[in-house]
């Protein structure tokens, strides 16, 4: 009886607990801002004397429309911040759940992998060692990596090092798949060399309790040790020497030399081109008994994957690479849980898998758990976030962010939670399985692996020799395999948007799966953020383009909320992101009102002597104070707040605006969206985040079209405030009713302050100066605006 009672108590221990975060004061502040916005709208709509004062024209109506849009966006933000919560995880209780895992349970993923979660699990990779997004596939978590072309492939090869903590059972279900979309022999060579280095690196980490498993970070600083640590010092010196040798070998590697002298191991790369090559699948490390590291082994399989590419087939960028990796991992190890991380990220917390498992398995309706997302964090980042790309304040939701995410494979396969319950008994004959047979098409091995995932019973699945499944893996990674199937539509990562990660997460939510956010201390994964103006704005343009594509497509969240299982508040949360491009257009219209009124001697804001001026001033002060305190609460500095505030204006008038017009032109058939890779320039040695720039915190420019609208806006405001000041000083506006007041001048000055990097860029030199081609095109836009303004 006592034993039964103890067993029940052990099983009832919580794996996670949801702790609501009380934000009463914040809610009140939200309503204050909303009230002021509505008051401004009411005042503008009921201003009977507007025509008499000369302010009832187009500027007044445009201002009303823009301010109504701002109120709508504020409502979306209020929804996203309405009921925040954190999840406290208890990984120490996983052992108790493991003991119960041998009995039948409702969970579809508990029986196949929890043995693996008894010990710490760290998935570490050196950014230069793998070429892309990293996929882990184990009987618990799977890890998958989809590789970057060229620059982010070979350069990422040295720093992605596979790790390890010990695994007691089912070692063969732990695997790492690295995708190289560039099909580079140098990337493959780097992975092979990194795996060899891991034979000494992993035991060193175990012996000395090293928590930072990424060697480029660990060796960036000298360790602290005492007189009794002679053995550790010797080991550290030896490992540092071995790592330096590894770095030199990889950096000195040449593709031509490898192909000429590498022998049969590189034969498949001989005629391969980046955009035209056959599928290449190579097992770099097979975790069988003879390859085990140490007495208990635990080092994962390491598989290199370069999916087939052909000029006649659309390869769907990252989504296509992730789908190929999903199929390859399914026919080789078929883990029920998968972790994917980008090529520039490494694991920073060895306990991250345990915490993620607590969230995947810890809910009462755990069968509905779809994914756990770890918010992105960055290493070696510039002080005070000068380019506003860390998203520490706005990115706190439950969206799938494309990296650092633990997925249940069943959710990726496009089925709904209810279908698993229905098909639990006799899964091979259940409707859900028959449907999946149609979706997965020709590969019997892939359909058989899917049967185990859908049934939720992994105990009967044999553990295969992965080397014997290479040909099958090549078959499912061929470019013709997806023809006639539902891959990219209902199965796998979704196609149809440049932000395939957000679209995939939305589809998972619309099917009825739940998600959770995982935040650990230290941060679970660290990556590098783009630096400089071109990289930052290119990234935001790509995001906004993809998000706007979703908004105007059949994947609109409003439709999914009506016809599928997407909750209404989830729908509003997705809309918060999808309207980025529309915000760019609306905010530009509002920003153009200021120079327009200064140039045409009009007014669209209240005069200081009017009662409505208090509403406008209160709204400006309240909103900025709210935003400022929000940054302070996140532990950021005043400078970080200002940098993000000014970058919001710059991004809106450049990246978001171009995304808006890009998608519109694509919609009417005049253009096609082009996937642009974000360049992330980082140090190749010490990982301290510094590059070759004299001042990496300064804004840099190039001839990209993304700089044209902001440059034009900067020039226009300089011209407008100059003309407006001239008129005010020399009294040319005395007899003009409704002329610009202090509000227009202050708004113009505030906007120029936000655009200060572009003001400096107009007179800067080198990469710190705006190219003459951009200045010329911007000048033409300014001239056109002045011409149109004078005609009115």
Curated annotation (Swiss-Prot):
Residues 140-151 have a biased composition (Gly residues). GO terms for molecular function: cellulose synthase (UDP-forming) activity; cellulose synthase activity. This is Putative cellulose synthase-like protein H3. Thought to be a Golgi-localized beta-glycan synthase that polymerize the backbones of noncellulosic polysaccharides (hemicelluloses) of plant cell wall. GO terms for biological process: cell wall organization; cellulose biosynthetic process; plant-type primary cell wall biogenesis. Pfam families: Cellulose_synt (PF03552). Residues 132-154 are annotated as: Disordered. The chain crosses the membrane at residues 25-45, 55-75, 579-599, 613-632, 650-670, 706-726, 739-759, 768-788. It is a multi-pass membrane protein. Belongs to the glycosyltransferase 2 family. Plant cellulose synthase-like H subfamily.
């Amino acid at each position: 009886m006592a034993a039964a009672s103890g067993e029940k108590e052990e099983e009832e221990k919580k794996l996670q607990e949801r702790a609501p975060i009380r934000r009463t004061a914040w809610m009140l502040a939200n309503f204050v801002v909303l009230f002021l916005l509505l008051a401004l709208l009411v005042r503008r709509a009921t201003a009977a004397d507007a025509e008499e004062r000369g302010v009832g024209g187009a500027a007044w109506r445009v201002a009303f429309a823009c301010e109504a849009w701002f109120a709508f966006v504020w409502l979306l933000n209020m929804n996203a911040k309405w009921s925040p919560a954190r999840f406290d995880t208890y990984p120490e209780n996983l052992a108790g759940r493991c003991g119960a895992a041998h009995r039948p349970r409702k969970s579809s993923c508990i029986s196949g992998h929890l043995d693996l979660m008894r010990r710490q699990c760290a998935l570490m990779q050196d950014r230069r060692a793998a070429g892309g997004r990293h996929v882990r596939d184990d009987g618990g978590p799977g890890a998958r990596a989809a590789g970057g072309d060229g620059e982010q492939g070979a350069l990422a090869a040295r720093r992605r090092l596979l790790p390890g903590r010990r695994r007691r059972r089912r070692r063969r279900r732990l695997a790492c798949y690295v995708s190289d979309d560039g099909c580079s022999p140098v990337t493959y060579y780097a992975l092979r060399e990194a795996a060899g280095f891991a034979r000494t690196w992993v035991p060193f980490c175990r012996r000395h309790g090293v928590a930072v498993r990424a060697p480029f970070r660990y060796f960036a600083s000298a360790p602290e040790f005492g007189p009794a640590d002679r053995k550790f010092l010797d080991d550290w010196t030896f490992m540092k020497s071995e790592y330096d040798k590894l770095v030199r070998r990889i950096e000195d590697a040449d593709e031509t030399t490898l192909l000429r002298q590498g022998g049969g191991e590189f034969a498949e790369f001989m005629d391969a081109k980046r955009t035209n090559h056959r599928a290449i699948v190579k097992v770099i490390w097979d975790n069988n008994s003879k390859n085990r590291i140490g007495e208990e082994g635990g080092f994962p399989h390491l598989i290199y994957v370069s999916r087939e590419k052909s000029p006649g087939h659309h390869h769907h960028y990252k989504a296509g690479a992730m789908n190929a990796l999903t199929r390859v991992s399914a026919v080789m190890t078929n883990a029920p849980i998968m972790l994917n991380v980008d090529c520039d990220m490494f694991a920073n917390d060895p306990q991250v898998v345990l915490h993620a498992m607590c969230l995947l398995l810890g809910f009462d309706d755990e069968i509905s758990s779809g994914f756990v997302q770890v918010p992105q964090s960055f290493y070696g980042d510039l002080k005070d976030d000068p380019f506003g790309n860390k998203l520490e304040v706005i990115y706190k939701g439950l969206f799938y962010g494309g990296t650092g995410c633990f997925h249940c494979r069943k959710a990726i396969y496009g089925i709904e939670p209810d279908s698993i319950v229905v098909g639990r008994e006799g899964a091979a004959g259940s409707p859900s399985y028959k449907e999946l047979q149609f979706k997965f098409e020709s590969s019997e091995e892939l359909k058989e692996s899917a049967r185990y995932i859908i049934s939720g019973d992994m105990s009967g699945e044999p553990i295969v020799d992965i080397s014997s499944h290479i040909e099958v893996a090549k078959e499912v990674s061929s470019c013709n395999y997806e023809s006639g199937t539902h891959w990219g539509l209902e199965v796998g990562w979704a196609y149809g948007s440049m932000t395939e990660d957000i679209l995939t997460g939305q589809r998972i939510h619309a099917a009825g799966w739940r998600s959770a956010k995982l935040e650990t201390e230290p941060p679970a994964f660290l990556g590098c953020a783009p630096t400089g103006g071109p990289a930052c704005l290119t990234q935001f343009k790509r995001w906004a383009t993809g998000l706007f594509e979703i908004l105007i497509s059949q994947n609109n969240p409003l439709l999914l909320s009506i016809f599928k299982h997407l909750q209404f508040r989830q729908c509003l949360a997705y809309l918060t992101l999808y309207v980025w491009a529309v915000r760019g257009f609306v905010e530009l219209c509002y920003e153009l009102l200021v120079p327009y009124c200064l140039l045409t001697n009009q007014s669209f804001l209240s005069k200081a002597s009017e009662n409505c001026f208090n509403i406008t001033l209160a709204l400006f002060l309240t909103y900025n104070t709210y935003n400022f305190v929000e940054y302070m609460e996140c532990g950021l500095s005043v400078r970080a707040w200002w940098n993000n505030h000014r970058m919001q204006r710059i991004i809106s008038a450049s990246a978001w605006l171009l995304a808006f017009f890009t998608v519109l032109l694509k919609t009417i058939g005049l253009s096609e969206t082009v996937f642009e890779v974000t360049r992330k320039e980082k140090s190749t040695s010490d990982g301290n985040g510094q590059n070759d720039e004299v001042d990496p915190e300064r804004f840099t420019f190039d001839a990209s079209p993304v700089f044209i609208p902001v440059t034009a806006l900067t020039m226009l405001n300089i011209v407008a405030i100059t003309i407006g000041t001239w008129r005010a000083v020399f009294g040319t506006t005395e007899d003009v009713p409704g002329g610009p007041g202090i509000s227009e001048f202050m708004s113009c000055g505030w906007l120029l302050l936000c655009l200060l990097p572009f003001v400096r860029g107009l007179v800067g030199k080198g990469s710190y100066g705006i190219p003459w081609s951009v200045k010329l095109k911007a000048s033409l836009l300014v001239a056109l605006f002045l011409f149109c303004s004078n005609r009115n």
